């Protein structure tokens, strides 16, 4: 890509396909969501292909011994869940984590198959953000 992604998106110079985009609670210091909201809103105005937004906020087990130092859901912390590889990590995952992982694998698989992860698309009129957490 030869230009800034946000500039290309605003000008309609990105692929005209469905998008599923999201962030974790601590992506970019917790500031990642606003630019994603803008992208999804602009996308809904430019294309009939939807944009689906997610927000991963599961604080990973093993990082919560001292709540004052809890890093939150750091960048890439959702990857074990979305690829169904919790058993490859040292973390003390619970049954709820495995259920969350299963739901995320289902959503990504559904999106790859059909272009729809199983929740409403984000639009200016209906700003849906799917939250992934164990609670």
Where are these regions (language model features)?
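C-terminal helix-and-tail extensions that cap enzymatic domains
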Residues: 4-135
